[in-house]
Every structure is written in C-alpha cells, then in structure tokens.
C-alpha cells in the first residue's frame, strides 16, 4: 500500500511540474498509474528485516518469514535492511538492500566532466589538464541494436491481439542483464580511476530528452534513447560515493565547457 501511495504521489508531483510552463525538464505529460493485468499483473513485494529469521539456514542463507513462507535467500550480506522481490520481463529479481558507510566527501578541488554518447559511451575531461579519456561504447551499442532487432522481429510475428510473449520477455531480460554487466565493468573502472586521481567531483551531462527522444532524428533516436544511461549514472554515483567522490548531474552544455 505504501508503494502504491508513493506511485500516486510521484504522479501528482510530475503532473505539477508538467503544468508549470517555466519547468522545461518535464516535456511529456505523465500518465496516472494504471491497473495491473487481472491474471498476470504482479506487484513488488518488500520484506523488512523484521520478517527475517534470527538464525541463518544450513548454507548461511537468509530466511524470509520462517513461520509462514520460509523463503531462503542466498546472500553474503550480514545485516540486510530489506529484501525486495521484483517481477520484471517474465521472471522475478531479488534485491537485497543494505547500508554501507560512506567516506567523507573530498575537498581536493579536482574535477572531471563526462559527456555520454553512443560510439563513445563516455568522453571525460579533467580540470587539471590531464589528457581526456574516451570510453568506447561499441559493445554497448551492438548489444542494444542486436536485441532491438530480435525484439522487433519477434513482435512482428505476434498475432494482432497479442502484445508480447515469453520469448520477447526473455529477450528484454537478456538485453538488460548484458547492458547492466557492461555498465558495472565500466563504472567500476571509472570509479577506481577517479579515486586514483583524487577527484572531488564528477559532473555528468544529463540530457532530459534521452527518454522522450525530442529533437533527435529517428535513426539516432533508435540507437541513443534506448540505451539506459540513467542506470549507468546511478551505478557510477554509488561506486564513487563509496570513495568520497560526489557525482553531479548537469545539463550537457555545462559539462562540455
């Protein structure tokens, strides 16, 4: 119920921003959260640490609701805050949420700016004159394009009254997992690199049209918008925060200066 209430609150906040003509960030009218499918719809289920068994299982797994459900969750995390079971793309993902101690933010006055793209996933410049760094994005691009073609081909074979299938769900899931794996490798490398350079802040150029595709040609839009840059930024943020480096999102025009 709390999650549903939060979804409705978020909708009205977005709607307020959309109706505010001075707010140029929200360009598409938000849609009110709809009903789930009456037979296939699934909600996210969250288990707080109050539902965990006091003792671990035989293989040191976490036990959810030992008296009623007795669900074993393999995890090395000692003191999880909660566990979420998330239905997505025809399967269930398990998120184990825990708290970690962050390093205090640095005050080195050394900065970096990142512009995100397609062929070059990240173009990075440094305030101290260090040579720019380019992170090639060809593998991410080919994963994205390859799965998009497979999904489009599978969708074209569906009956008129059918919107998706188990095979399409599996393609979406595989695409997302491969992209996420690549992002983890790249953001892990960047966080280590920035740490070695003793950076204080990293500014990431954020384009509010990534999702809506406004002002992008159809060909570029197919390649650019569907790459989940927000997930890349999110991963970079938390990995840098563990090292005392702040990641700030700004409009692309500022990071390029």
Q: Whereabouts are the PLM-identified features?
A:
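Acidic carboxylate diad motif detector
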Residues: 1-88, 226
């Amino acid at each position: 119920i709390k999650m549903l209430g939060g979804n409705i609150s978020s909708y009205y906040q977005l709607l307020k921003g959309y109706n505010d003509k001075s707010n140029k960030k929200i360009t598409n009218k938000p849609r009110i959260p709809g009903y789930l499918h009456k037979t296939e719809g699934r909600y996210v289920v969250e288990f707080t640490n109050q539902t965990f068994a006091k003792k671990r299982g035989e293989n040191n797994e976490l036990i959810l609701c030992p008296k009623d459900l007795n669900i074993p969750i393999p995890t090395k995390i000692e003191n999880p805050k909660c566990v979420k079971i998330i239905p997505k793309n025809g399967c269930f993902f398990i998120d184990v949420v825990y708290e970690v101690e962050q390093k205090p933010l640095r005050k080195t006055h050394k900065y970096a700016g990142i512009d995100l793209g397609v062929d070059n996933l990240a173009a990075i410049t440094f305030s101290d004159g260090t040579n720019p760094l380019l992170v090639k994005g060809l593998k991410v691009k080919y994963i994205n394009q390859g799965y998009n073609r497979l999904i489009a081909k599978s969708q074209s074979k569906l009956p008129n009254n059918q919107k998706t299938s188990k095979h399409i769900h599996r393609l979406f899931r595989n695409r997302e997992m491969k992209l996420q794996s690549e992002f983890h490798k790249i953001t892990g490398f960047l966080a280590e690199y920035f740490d070695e350079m003793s950076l204080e802040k990293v500014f990431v150029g954020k384009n509010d049209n990534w999702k809506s595709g406004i002002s992008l040609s159809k060909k570029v839009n197919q390649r650019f918008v569907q790459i989940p840059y927000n997930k890349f930024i999110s991963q970079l943020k938390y990995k840098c925060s563990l090292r005392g480096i702040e990641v700030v999102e700004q409009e692309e025009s500022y990071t390029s200066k």
